[in-house]
Amino acid sequence: FLLSLYATSLEHMKSNGVQSLFEKIENPLAAVLAEMEKAGIATDQKRWEAVCHELKVRERKLLSLIYEAAGEEFNVNSPKQLGVILFEKMGMPAGKKTKNGYSTAADVLEMLAKSYPFVKDILEYRTISKLISTYLEALPLLIRPETGRIHTSFNQTVTATGRVSSSDP
């Protein structure tokens, strides 16, 4: 079965003019990607922890500045609570409304930041918070103890543009 599938695929590649691309680029790349997956990605654990610490310090500082500007503590990660603070308590012009309240999407906050500088702190807080939770705290858990490296799966044929992507992580 595989031999007939290969023959059919080869004929299909020839008729579409991509056989050379397959033989000279795609097929050799598969072997390189397999080696890269096996080797894994080295990490500098001490540097990782230092960066994480620096960002957590900055995150706490931003939270303090946000609370000070708002005059109270609230859940900055809650769009509903943030909307109440910005648009009701502080009287900023409300843009889009959603079914759950005021929109606090990045584009809305970026517009507000032009007139209300402290909103930049909220945007920076969101960025740093996302970096910490998505990468700095999550990726070290994916380091394989036997290699001390992160091993991913490279995808050669997933993207529409032809670039290589990775998954898991």
Give residue ranges: language-model regions:
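Conserved "right-hand" nucleotidyltransferase catalytic core of DNA-directed polymerases
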Residues: F1-P169
